Every structure is written in C-alpha cells, then in structure tokens.
Amino acid sequence: LKIDDWKKAKAIADYNHALREQGIRDDNFIHSRRLWIPWHLVHCTEEEVVVDKKPGARPVNLGGLPAEPGSAERRYPIFGKTLEKTPLLSNRLNGRVFYLVSGHGGPDTGAQGSHDGHDLCEDEYAYDVTLRLMRLLLQHGATAYMIVRDPNDGIRDNPYLKLDKDEVVWGNKKIPFDQKERLQQRCDIINQLTAEHKKWGVKQQTMIEIHVDSRHQDKRIDVFFYHRKSSGASKTLATKLLTKFKQEYESQLDRTYHGTISTRNLYSLDNTQTPRAVYIELGNIQNELDQQRLLIRTNRQALANWIFQTFMSE
C-alpha cells in the first residue's frame, strides 16, 4: 500500500481488529495477510465528520485516527455488558503496545484452591485482573491485545468466579490440550503481532503475563515478578512494578511488602520477542489471607490499577 504514515497504518490495523472483535470478519489479518482498507483512510486527504440523521446523534469520526478524549463512544463487548462502554480518557499511552496474557485457560484451569466450600481456579482470577488492566490501558490510548479471551465472562465483581473452559486465544483459536502447544500458540501470536508493529515503527512493546501461584496453605506470599533473562528493559520494568507495589502496600495496607523480582526459565519469557516481558504472580491461591487479594473485587481492581499506574508513570 506504500503507507509510511504511522497513524494511518495504525488506524487501518485498528479498523481491522475492530471488525474482528465485532464478528464482522472471521479471520485475523495478521494471519491471513488480508487487510480490509477503509476508502476514506487512503483517499480522503482531510478528516471527515458525518452526523447521523437521527435526532441527538453524535458526530462519528471517519478518520479512525487517535480520538480526542471523550470524543466518541467506544464499545468492547469483552468487558461485559456493564463495562463494555470504555471511554477514551487520555492519549497518554498512545503509540505503546501491550500484549496481556492471563495464565492457563481452556482445558487448563491452572492452580486450584478452595474457600468456604467454593473451588478457586487460577485461570479465572488471573483473567479478571488481566481484563481490568486491559480496560485501563485502552482508556488511556494504548493498543492492547488480550491474548487469552473468554467470550462471555466479562469483568466480574462476585467473589467466586465460576469455572468454565470456553476460553480461546486471539484470532478465536481453540486452546490445545498439550501444554507445550498451548504455550507455543501464545508465543506465536505475540511474535507475529510484535513483528507487524515493529514494521510500523513501534518501539514500545510490552508483554505482561499474570498468574496465581500455589504453595502450602500456610505460606503467605506477596505479589512477585519474573523478568526475561539478559533483558535490561524487562528487569527495569519489573523493578518499577516492585517499587510501585511496595509503595502501595506500605501506604495503603500499612505493612511491609516482601515481593521479589528474579529471572526464571519460563517458556513465555524465553520464546517471545517483545522488547520487554514480565511475568507476575499475584499470590498463593491456597493461603486464606492471600485469597482475599483475589476474592474481593476491589482488591482485584487495585492489582490492575497498580500495574497500570506503573506504565502511566514511565
């Protein structure tokens, strides 16, 4: 297409992603290599505004370029009916790309615990925190990909998140039963998207993977972080996250924070190509005190907030 304008290229990509999200097209252009090109983006030299003839209708920006905060209604069904309206509050994170991976999903529930007769499954709680983070990033202009996706869960406020196994990955692909295949599938998606954005000149690309650990039920642990080996940028990000959590623990919870950062041979850290990659463990799903971090919706939101605020402070 000979398009060398970053904003225009990103607008075309966002247009195709939106069509995929809304079910208008059934394939992912990253995989199929087929782009749908809006006529106005290529052939109209000036931004056009069209107003629906219905009384009280709001102007619709056809340009598809980064919107002004509050300029248009944006809907993301993945967040659920209550929160699908996701207004743009700022463009602070415009030009930055995030790949968000919630651990496990599909046939793999991950770690399990129990509380008052209810089963607690790692994949459900990791997904809810990750989805909350996703919404915050989108509200401030980031491009964010939710790699593991549930078609009907949305953001949930109840303490006990019901287990299901209908999660898919980006592109509506079924999650394999084999563990290595599952991990490689996610890495392939992230690497393909990373390469595409790199071609468009995007330098700030970050992968965040969120899990819940499982230890002996007496072992209480604070949120801790792994970063990609031999990646100074990943270590720096993990350090910033650790610092943020330490500040919040000490100011809001009034207790000492014992989180850590380290490296570890984790498949997703070793086999993805984003400039930065951090793997987050939210707590011990077996421990009664750590479970409160997961069961209480405001705590899940706080976890997402602190991760998000770290990005906003960069």
What are these regions (language model features)?
Residues 2-7, 116, 120-128, 177-184, ...:
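Soluble non-cytosolic domains of exported or imported proteins
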Residues 3-51:
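Extracellular LysM carbohydrate-binding repeats and other cell-envelope/extracellular binding modules
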Residues 19, 42-43, 104-107, 144, ...:
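Solvent-exposed loop/turn segments at secondary-structure junctions
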Residues 31-36, 41-78:
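Helix-enriched interaction subdomains in cytosolic or periplasmic regions
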Residues 73-187, 213-216:
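Active-site histidine-acidic residue metal-binding/catalytic motifs
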Residues 97-101, 143-148, 205-210, 224-225, ...:
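Structural recognition of the beta-strand scaffold that forms the well-ordered cores
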Residues 108-121, 213-243:
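A short, glycine/acidic-enriched catalytic loop
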Residues 214, 225-228, 251-314:
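Active-site-adjacent mobile loop/cap segments within catalytic or ligand-binding domains
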